[in-house]
Amino acid sequence: MDEIREPYIVQQSNEEALYTKLQKQTLEYVQRLSGTVWTDYNPHDPGVTLSEAANYALTEIDYKYSFPLIDYLVEEDRPFIPERFGLFPPKDVFGGSIVTLDDYKRLFLSSIPEITNLQIDFDALTGAYSVSFVKTPFKGEEEQIVKKIRTIYNENRNLCEWLDKVEVAKTETLFFESEFEIYPGEDPTTVLARVYWCILYYLSDNQDSVSSNKTRTEYELYKQLYNVEGVKNFHTCFLMKSGVPQSRFPDNSTLFIPSKMDDLDDIVIYCGKTKVKIDIDLFIERLRALSLSGRANNASETGRTELPTGMWHNIFDHYPIAHDMPDCYQLNPDEEIPASSFDAYIHLYDWVMKNGLEEIQILPRLLSINKEDNDFIYTERTIMLKNNYLDFLDKLYGIDSQPSWLLEDNSYGETPEEALYRRMRCLRNVTKLQRDRAKAKNINMLETKGNIPMIKEWFCLLIGIDPDDDHIVSNVLPKHNLLLIEREKHSSDIIRRVDSLLIEEKMMDADNVQDVSYVVLSEDSDEKKNEYMEMRKLLPFFNENLITADLFRNGTNLSNYKIVKSADDEYMLMYHHHEFAGWMNLGHGTDKSILETLANILRRYLRELNHECETLYVVEPVLADQSRPSELLIVLPAWTYRFHKARFREECCKLLRSIVPAHLTGKIFWISEKRMRKFEDYYHQLLRSYTNESLIEHKKLLLGALEEQLADAEYIQTLDDSN
């Protein structure tokens, strides 16, 4: 139990008080320094007066710094919420994902009250599950139960697995025959309903028996029946099948429920020596109520962890030391500019203490990983501190949200603040990324936002790209009226049109070549649109609606642009190709500063396009071809600056190998924009065909057409890292 915080400071003895200790140490130190010259303790002695005021201030600061850490993570209008700081409860961190047959069994039993038993089988050769269920005797249409099972399965489906058959199980009906006595005052109808519910619950796959593999026997059942409220004793008690008493009960056993008085002929209830009667309608009503409430009470519940709450303290105002000094020193504590050197000395004390309190005040927002706190204004120091805290969270959860290879190319100009936001977004989702990394796309809910395989979400969150499956990357450049030109893949006519913009190296006089300086551009979205429109008007190469892959990729680096002064006192904005020789004339003019600004705008424009063109697709062939279980096809674009680099591809491959479940194999394909356009079309058609049983052959054809596009991939890697 937390200690009760009293609304006052506990009084200490004079010897234990911090102020007394500080003052004693100060005076001893001053006396040692002064030697034979000593003070008379008058106000005109600034040393002693200052020590008293400063020690009082230090005592107050010590009090303000003495609260439990959790209190400093509470704000006046916001309580302590561990998730805000990336401190997730154990049930989220260590909660098990749905993997085994028992996991699915628990899931269905806790989610569907209309079933009492079920059998789940898994075929490793096809990756298919089969479910047979026993429904309760009271409610539930079979078709609705089948639909619920399929819905719940697909919400929790793992990669390269699928649900095949869902059907009603063949059951063995048992009949209850008994003669027993109840206590006086008990309602016989209610007691009989309790007895039937006890038998039903024992025969069902309740949460406690899912993984226990216990054999159901008459002995165990009778022990439970004797504990039923209202039952005094049993004279006879049998579960009968075809007139034969049963000693063991199979998993598919179900209990016959009486619906009319004739069904109760083999059940006799006594109260004392008097035979009592049963109200059959009331019996059915009570048994139905017990069934519903019993399933609810026995559904799996996760224990709640008691969390500390913390308490906010109004401790952030600092009372200047100068206010405690005599007026004869003529100090100005409320003025920013000190009146004297002594005043400046006092200001320094106050600055240190005030700055410390301000750092404590911003602590909740500094350590927060919530999106709502993204408006926090960062400095160079707070960025360093925040990164240190995020590094701590990385180690806590065993991930790396800031791999070194991701920083090598600055992620298209990602600012330190943007890098923090990317890391925070990744860490906000760390529990589900770790726990559910095998989780697949829900093929029944294709239009639902956020419905993506977990390995895609992990990859995209880590490198900072859009994880939405509806983001069509092959449409990005056409949307901007641009055609990407890869020299080795287009006609000689197009190449000649591009080459007409090139200038040979020998025409570049080094004395006339200048670097392009960095220009600060507007961050306003409307201003950016206007800048891009103006850029397209002023740079002639946009008139062709063509862009070389070299310029598209390497134009993201400002050092590849140059300003060249021509003979007629004009300037040309030049781009130096990296992937083949030559310079490209992007535009010209008499004002060098305008060309520099255009180069900066073009670089930012290309960075945004590159970033927008990056994604990852996950294909599960087994959903179209049952002969290919445990196989994944992972597809990425090959035409962006980062995704075109060999080192970046290798690091992405290592990352994917680390997050893809170990039992799965497959390949990673890096494909061109042209191939991606057809691939995305086939991919979305394939998704829509998964749930249509009449399109079995069509699904295989779509998968084949999709793999034809992958056969010509620029680079292929394997997910199998066993070598």
What are these regions (language model features)?
Residues 177, 194, 201-266, 270:
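Membrane-proximal bilayer-interacting regions
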